Amino acid sequence: MTEKHLFTSESVSEGHPDKIADQISDSILDAMLEQDPEARVAVETTVTTGLVVVVGEVSTTAHIDIQKVVRETIKEIGYKNGKYGFDGDNCAVITAIDEQSPDIALGVDNSLEVKNGDVDPLDQIGAGDQGMMFGYAINETPELMPLPISLSHHLMKKVAEVRKNGTLAYLGPDAKAQVTVEYDDNNQPLRIDTVVLSTQHDENISLDQIRKDVMDQVITKVIPDKYLDSNTKYFINPTGRFVIGGPQGDAGLTGRKIIVDTYGGYAHHGGGAFSGKDATKVDRSASYAARYIAKNIVAAGLASQVEVQISYAIGVAQPVSVSVNTFGSGKVPNQKLVDAIRKVFDLRPAGIIKMLDLRRPIYKKTAAYGHFGRTDIDLPWEKTDKINELKKELDF
């Protein structure tokens, strides 16, 4: 008898309170990078009814209007005219921004390697913190992402599309989706077991209409027919009402959706959030590098799935460790993969920044609908341009 198992991942919309906070933090980061590509930025945002609070540490020559950036971001998401209990024009915005700690800057500006006499310019920047970061790729979708998180993101993007283009103009900005996939004993996706989708809506719309419209205009347009059958379960706005949402319904905070941002729980996570951080913070840049490595390994046919871990010590440029797990799917030994990774990819913070060109204002667009597997935007860590170098290094 074939043993089947279920796996579930979720995504949230750009109007979810935590995602509003992420987008504000990354909008501020982008605004600073536009003026000062060398800016050191660590910005955290919290949102609640009628209030946005922005705190953090910044070292930059940029002069930006944080109030304007915050308000424009909120309005772009869809919170304007007071319609959904939160309004970019009328909310209060409080900021408390300090300079980066000189003790941290001491290790980031001049790494341990430089202090010991190394002169390679890419050794200059030390890791901004200790920690471990993970990257993952699997060949079950064209973008080399796990199917549950991929479908969850696509559902949320479709909800935003039909809200903004007027197809379902009664929808509000806040929404969540969750997809449960049934796998066979070879870990191949068989079918969709359950779809959960909750979306904010205007008060005068009936639940029956919402359920029909979401089914017709979102779910059936996103999920391939081959995965749906008569036993697939759908829970559309299962509470029966979702009028109050966004920051009026729940407070939001930067960095609270790290699993949505990555692989939907399908792979490990080092715990560090991305949004609001410049590329000297390895929480962000090394996670992007790890995904870049993993995607190129799978795209090269060296494994059908792989998880890459990189770890750092604060103030030290070279990673403390690099490891891989191919879950038995590798075509070459793991140690050979690690050796090839170290030769093909420069994993010093300055090396990652150069390799992926990370001193650009490219981050706001990553702050909703996932940082990985994106086909709608051009992200450097999603490129598969290291395939030939990896194969050559491994004689594959």
Swiss-Prot record:
Keyword Disulfide bond: no
Binding-site positions, K(+): 44
Record-listed Mg(2+) binding positions: 18
InterPro entries: ADOMET_SYNTHASE_CS (IPR022631), S-AdoMet_synt_C (IPR022630), S-AdoMet_synt_central (IPR022629), S-AdoMet_synt_N (IPR022628), S-AdoMet_synthetase (IPR002133), S-AdoMet_synthetase_sfam (IPR022636)
Gene3D superfamilies tied to this protein: 3.30.300.10
Reactions catalysed according to its record: L-methionine + ATP + H2O = S-adenosyl-L-methionine + phosphate + diphosphate
Residues that bind ATP: 16, 174-176, 241-242, 250, 256-257, 273, 277
Compartmental location: Cytoplasm
BP terms from Gene Ontology: one-carbon metabolic process; S-adenosylmethionine biosynthetic process
Uppermost EC category: transferase
Stored Pfam families: S-AdoMet_synt_C, S-AdoMet_synt_M, S-AdoMet_synt_N
Main location: cytoplasm
The record's free-text note on cofactor binding: Binds 2 divalent ions per subunit.
GO MF terms held by the record: ATP binding; magnesium ion binding; methionine adenosyltransferase activity
Pathway: Amino-acid biosynthesis; S-adenosyl-L-methionine biosynthesis; S-adenosyl-L-methionine from L-methionine: step 1/1
Ligand binding (L-methionine): 57, 100, 250, 281
EC number: 2.5.1.6
Domain of life: Bacteria
Keyword Cytoplasm belongs to the record: yes
Flexible loop as annotated region, ranges: 100-110
Record-stated family: Belongs to the AdoMet synthase family.
Quaternary structure note: Homotetramer; dimer of dimers.
Chain's role: Catalyzes the formation of S-adenosylmethionine (AdoMet) from methionine and ATP. The overall synthetic reaction is composed of two sequential steps, AdoMet formation and the subsequent tripolyphosphate hydrolysis which occurs prior to release of AdoMet from the enzyme.
Name the record gives this protein: S-adenosylmethionine synthase
Species: Ligilactobacillus salivarius (strain UCC118) (Lactobacillus salivarius)
Gene expressing this chain: metK
